[in-house]
């Protein structure tokens, strides 16, 4: 299953919860979940039957995958890697997802969504420890410095995004220097650091069935 390239607002409606895939629009009255809080399609407003246990786990898996915007293959590979590591599988899995460069760029406020962050990375606007990295799935390590590339510092999009970050706080596992257009990945986030509308235990059960 490849990466979804259609209207992202449909994904929120399909999962029945805001996934915050479109930046500021998700916080405005224009958000599709505010205007049409039911699944897309001609039968979306009909009362749904009680879902099976499998369907509940599938929806939770899809919800988490769509939040991070990655393909099923990438998602499954990260899960399998997490399941082989020491620690609580769910927390380790979320840590791997949060360590992706596109996600860190989004968390630092260089981009308003993970989709936009992927574009910035792919187009060479981001450096890690002073070296340009154009792979969104690049694994960021604790202590790494993530910055806007020198040639990209006058891009209006990035400047506007960082201007909006003034007065805001990034997650406690990150540090941000707005004026310097750079930040640091201090550590892997703890589960309580992440305000994700997901029960990762159901995702584990889905893949462990």
Curated annotation (Swiss-Prot):
One of its GO terms (biological process) is translation. Disulfide bonds: none annotated. Keywords: Metal-binding, Ribonucleoprotein, Ribosomal protein, RNA-binding, rRNA-binding, Zinc. Residues 99-161 form the S4 RNA-binding domain. Pfam families: Ribosomal_S4, S4. GO terms for molecular function: metal ion binding; rRNA binding; structural constituent of ribosome. The keyword Oxidoreductase does not apply. Gene3D superfamilies: Ribosomal Protein S4 Delta 41, Chain A, domain 1, RNA-binding S4 domain. Binds 1 zinc ion per subunit. In a number of structures (e.g. 4Y4O, 5FDV) a 4Fe-4S cluster is seen in place of the zinc cofactor. One of its GO terms (cellular component) is small ribosomal subunit. Its cofactor is Zn(2+); [4Fe-4S] cluster. SUPFAM superfamilies: Alpha-L RNA-binding motif. The keyword Ribonucleoprotein applies. Coiled coil: none annotated. Zn(2+) binds at residues 9, 12, 26, 31. One of the primary rRNA binding proteins, it binds directly to 16S rRNA where it helps nucleate assembly of the body and platform of the 30S subunit. Binds mRNA in the 70S ribosome, positioning it for translation. Belongs to the universal ribosomal protein uS4 family. Part of the 30S ribosomal subunit. Contacts protein S5. The interaction surface between S4 and S5 is involved in control of translational fidelity. This is Small ribosomal subunit protein uS4. It comes from Thermus thermophilus (strain ATCC 27634 / DSM 579 / HB8). The gene is rpsD.
